[in-house]
Amino acid sequence: MTNMRKTHPLMKIINNSFIDLPAPSNISSWWNFGSLLGICLVLQIITGMFLAMHYTSDTMTAFSSVTHICRDVNYGWLIRYLHANGASMFFICLFMHVGRGLYYGSYMFTETWNIGVLLLFAVMATAFMGYVLPWGQMSFWGATVITNLLSAIPYIGTDLVEWIWGGFSVDKATLTRFFAFHFILPFIIAALAGVHLLFLHETGSNNPSGLSSDTDKIPFHPYYTIKDILGALILILIISLLVLFSPDLLGDPDNYTPANPLNTPPHIKPEWYFLFAYAILRSIPNKLGGVLALVLSILVLALLPLLHTSKQRSMMFRPLSQCLFWLLAADLLTLTWIGGQPVEHPFIIIGQVASVLYFFLILIIMPLASIMENNMLKW
């Protein structure tokens, strides 16, 4: 009798993706984040669906419907905070996943990498629109500031902003459409993640050495299924601690005040995971320049395959590139800190230096360091 998992049309897909998939024998815990992102996405879709059952996307009732979820719905507070902190965990896993790809040269799988960049944009758009939904002060003013950036686009900018707003300011129409987009985008993200995996399985996984692992493969199950389960348990532990002990740790107190178009909060800032991009946006005095820098701060990732000048794929055996990588990581942490600070001395200049360093490192210093390493090895 033939094995059903190897013959059944549906089971065969699952089998070839998660059971009999040949995987490199030496992939480290940095390869766990893909599965963790999948878990985060499922968690967000499930909690989001339950929240949508009780939420109303109307400016008059949105804030009170969220209060109602937290106070009156059975375990509503838990669902709401799982969803809010699940987004933070999602971005932590995303940053780790992208960082792993940058360090070990995974961007050389160009199709997989470019779909990953597209996924990053989609997740950022979804998170931004989700932050608007509770209709607190920071929701309203965040939506106003960020959508207003599109007015920097020459000629069509103003019309485009009013088209997105559905009027002359962020109002009922904006909230309703943001809710619609926030609901549909995660399913598009799930489909894109499927395509991401499809392209990954065309080439097989990369590994820490950056060398071909064709000579030494092991089956995904049980080796990496058990490893992914350990990662999942750690993720669940962290998110449980966050949700049950300090659910508002990563939030903004301003968002507990209902949206008021007549009162601007002293410091408008997005959620922590956007602060690095927000700092880059603010560090350029020109509006259009700032918007371009904001988009390029993520889009620059798509250029990495073109900027790879080293004859080795991974940074594992390249100490100079390793130092620059961790300098880039420290720079991003600096930008995140600056993004949450008021626009005053010395934060302005720190933000500008960190922003210039960010692009300078990726576009110029790292490719040059790779060429130097090639020469040092007399390649």
Swiss-Prot record:
A ubiquinone binds at residue 201. Keywords: Electron transport, Heme, Iron, Membrane, Metal-binding, Mitochondrion, Mitochondrion inner membrane, Respiratory chain, Transmembrane, Transmembrane helix, Transport, Ubiquinone. Heme b b562 binds at residues 83, 182. InterPro entries: Cyt_b/b6_C, Cyt_b/b6_C_sf, Cyt_b/b6_N, Cytb/b6-like_sf, Cytochrome_b, Cytochrome_b_C_euk/bac, Cytochrome_b_N_euk/bac, Di-haem_cyt_TM. It is found in: Mitochondrion inner membrane. The keyword Chaperone does not apply. It is a multi-pass membrane protein. Heme 1 (or BL or b562) is low-potential and absorbs at about 562 nm, and heme 2 (or BH or b566) is high-potential and absorbs at about 566 nm. PANTHER family: CYTOCHROME B. This is Cytochrome b. It comes from Galemys pyrenaicus (Iberian desman). The gene is MT-CYB.
